[in-house]
């Protein structure tokens, strides 16, 4: 029997998750969607695809939880500020949860979700760190784990987005926790994965406003660099940008004692190269979805399989707590101009 799942949130991510579940996850059945945005509700109610698949449309999350008696799981893809409360309500209802990153920008709130999940071991509750499901990043992990580069000690990772001309990023900035929390969170997660969960020791950062001066009202920037020193001598360097001219550009380089692994050194939309009097050139994906569409499908399939086959979820929920601690420390360092330090147990001391 397929897993009955509801998608919460119908913004740019929610719509894509519904489509993925409908056409790329054969063991899942989308039974409902929920959004509080009137325009999204109208769009869903008049969408022939949703009618064809008999997807119920709700504008109230609590009402959906009460009405959908056969519901088994939810995929939370709303704005960050309600991730935790919606996950908690689902857990209390006895539902499995796949929650987009981050669980919350408030560490205590995020920890409450982890605690609730632990109190219900029969439920699968997973954090959505999608890059862990990308074939290239997984191949890099396998090479590192097999000892191909010796002991990894340095990660350099970028998340650079195409310059946003629509105003979406500026509007979203008030709720996303800042550029390091929103933009570098995947890079931080990859660092913990590739370097075997090192404990942070110190964070410092700097940034600038190049295209979106309005971000200053939220204490944020559109370009930033952060460095994390870990206990034991490991280091990570992150570059985040919202102003790239060429497209979505994500690069990760892991250096070890006997070599290095690089992922996506030269971003490209596909394998087409145009050769003319101007030389050789290729196009780049405009945004993250074109780069990670397959990863999101893999993530969904593995979550559904974990539920239906009673397997361990591929990404532990606790991972999100450590990632958020580092992301917030970098954001604090960015705003204060001071180094943020951690003790030997990974707890902040300033």
Describe these PLM feature segments.
Residues 1-51, 191:
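N-terminal Rossmann-like dinucleotide-binding module
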Residues 36-40, 245, 289-301, 315, ...:
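Active-site loop of classical SDR/Rossmann-like NAD(P)-dependent oxidoreductases
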Residues 39, 53-116:
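Beta-loop-alpha module in the N-terminal Rossmann-like domain of NAD(P)-dependent dehydrogenases
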Residues 63, 73-75, 305-350:
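C-terminal helix-rich "cap/oligomerization" subdomain common to oxidoreductases
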Residues 94, 121-122, 147, 233, ...:
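Glycine-centered short loops/turns at secondary-structure junctions
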Residues 99, 105, 125-127, 156, ...:
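Hydrophobic residues in well-ordered beta-strands that form the structural core
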Residues 123, 131-217, 337:
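Predominantly a Rossmann-like dinucleotide-binding segment in NAD(P)-dependent oxidoreductases
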Residues 189-269, 297-313, 343-350:
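Contiguous beta-strand/loop segments that form the cofactor/metal-binding neighborhood of enzyme cores
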